[in-house]
Amino acid sequence: MAISTIQIILIFIWSSVVGMGSVLDEFQTHRPLIACSIMGLILGDPKTGIILGGTLELIALGWMNIGAAQSPDSALASTISTILVIVGNQDIQKGIAIALPVAAAGQVLTVLARTVTVAFQHAADREAEKANFTAIIWLHFTALIVQALRVSIPTTIVAVFVSPEEIKSMLDALPEVITGGLAVAGGFIVVVGYAMILNMMSVKYLMPFFYQGFVLGGYLKLSLLAWGAVGLIFAIVYVQLNPKFATNHNNGTGGSGGTVAAAGDHPAALPEDELDD
């Protein structure tokens, strides 16, 4: 498929939003599930965008910045891989093979962009000494634009200068050992990502629910949506039966009914005029 001028403009705008989202973290627009889905919608194939985004999201679950160490750039990997997969009419496995090296290249661009923005922060410090708030605001927005261009420029270059025929021939030229190896590595990364998250979320008194999910999953043929609903129900029931929640409810924080019950059970909690009567 050929990319129209309107699509190129929308790609530039959306990739800029994705780049800013990678440092703002407020709306999570840099996450693969969101970035790929919207990019797929722009290119007219939201289904492929959602599938690719969900697959890359599993891989990127364990990616996180630790101190000054930058994780692979899921934002740039999401935008470029979606364009190459949809425009080049490739499968999801090829998209994973594309995304992993692009994420590594984006990691270098992230370090470079963050290094450049340090100069803007020092300039903002100097303006703060002069109480020049307008300049401080503009300097912060300018630093944010650097993060936007970090993703939008490479993505737009790929969308403008790489034709579908070139994409197809380039990806088809990759040896099977490379694409297959990257696909297997991507599967390992998914497992590692899940393991890291489960290790952080590991709470002994919640582990029975975790094991119960595997047991039920082996016998009940339910969809992921149904399992999500079952998990939500278990969570609600657990919170309602939790002694801490019950204590707060009995103390009156759960509503007017709880307050009346607490007052009836404890005469000392009644007003003084009622005690005098």
Curated annotation (Swiss-Prot):
GO cellular component, one term: plasma membrane
Domain named PTS EIIC type-4: residues: 3-237
Topology with respect to the bilayer: Multi-pass membrane protein
Example of a GO biological process term: phosphoenolpyruvate-dependent sugar phosphotransferase system
Transmembrane segments: 1-21, 92-112, 133-153, 177-197, 219-239
Descriptive protein name: PTS system sorbose-specific EIIC component
Main subcellular location of this protein, as a coarse class: membrane
Naturally occurring in which organism (per UniProt): Lacticaseibacillus casei (Lactobacillus casei)
